[in-house]
Amino acid sequence: MASKSVVVLLFLALIASSAIAQAPGPAPTRSPLPSPAQPPRTAAPTPSITPTPTPTPSATPTAAPVSPPAGSPLPSSASPPAPPTSLTPDGAPVAGPTGSTPVDNNNAATLAAGSLAGFVFVASLLL
């Protein structure tokens, strides 16, 4: 009788591990582009601490012009709109990966049916 209970416990462990392995979860996120190799970092040169002489102002500052120069665009004119750009870079897939996602699969129903069948089978072994 002890060997039968060991077999039943092993079978229950197998059912539990398979149910955990088949449970839907978030898909792993990976970038479709390879990661670029980073160049080795070099130490930045230390700046010298010699004081820089301050230039003496030789000319008086001039006032800013009040009106824009002739031929320049007026501030009220709007720039043309930017051309439309795609949201995905060139060469990237338009849609997501072709694997199943948690939204569009029915693993939950299959998992529940398989678990119920497993429990019924184990219960029939015990009786």
Curated annotation (Swiss-Prot):
Pyrrolidone carboxylic acid sites (modified residues): Q22
Lipid linkage positions (GPI-anchor amidated asparagine): N107
UniProt modified residues of type 4-hydroxyproline: P24, P26, P28, P32, P36
InterPro entries: AGP
Domain of life: Eukaryota
Membrane topology summary: Lipid-anchor; GPI-anchor
Compositionally biased region (Polar residues): 98-107
Compositionally skewed regions (Pro residues) per UniProt: 25-39, 48-58, 66-86
PTM info: O-glycosylated on hydroxyprolines; noncontiguous hydroxylproline residues are glycosylated with arabinogalactan.
PANTHER family: CLASSICAL ARABINOGALACTAN PROTEIN 10-RELATED, CLASSICAL ARABINOGALACTAN PROTEIN 9
Family as reported in the entry's similarity comment: Belongs to the classical AGP family.
Protein name in the entry: Classical arabinogalactan protein 10
